[in-house]
Amino acid sequence: MRITGQPHVYKKDTIIRLKPLSLNSNNRSYVFSSSKGNIQNIINHLNNLNEIVGRSLLGIWKINSYFGLSKDPSESKSKNPSVFNTAKTIFKSGGVDYSSQLKEIKSLLEAQNTRIKNLEKAIQSLDNKIEPEPLTKKEVKELKESINSIKEGLKNIIG
C-alpha cells in the first residue's frame, strides 16, 4: 500500500501518520458521541478529530502546492514557488517599478492583437472558400443530366 493511501501529514521532510478512524465510523460519517464516558472513548474521539484536521490540512497543502504557493516534494504536480518570490521582493524594496511590467504587457497585447488579426484573416479566407449557397436538388439533377448527355455523346463519337 502506498504511503499516500493512508492518512498522513508532512512536517519538515518527515511523514506523520495519522491514526485511523474508530471502528464505529465509516468513510462518510464520523462518530463523536458514545454511550460511555470513559477515557478510551475520549481518546478515540480526539484521534477522530486529529484525523479530520490532518486530512483537511493535507488537502490545503496539496492545493497550495498545486498552485505553486508551497512546494510539496511528494507531489509530481507541485510547482516551484519561485514565481511568488516577487511579492517578497516588492515588499522588501518598498514598492515596484511598473514601467518594465507595462512594457511587457504592451508587447504581449501587440502580439495578441497580431494573432487575432491573423485569425480573422484565416476565417475570412475560409469564408471565401465556402460556397455561399448549397446546391438544390434541381441543380444536382440538371448536372447529372448534362453529365449523362456528355457520356452519351462520347459513346457515339468513340463508338
Curated annotation (Swiss-Prot):
InterPro entries, sorted: Caulimo_AT (IPR004917)
Organism domain of life: Viruses
Name of a matching Pfam family: Cauli_AT
Function in brief: This protein is involved in virus transmission.
Family to which the UniProt record says this protein belongs: Belongs to the caulimoviridae ORF II family.
Protein name: Aphid transmission protein
Origin organism lineage: Viruses, Riboviria, Pararnavirae, Artverviricota, Revtraviricetes
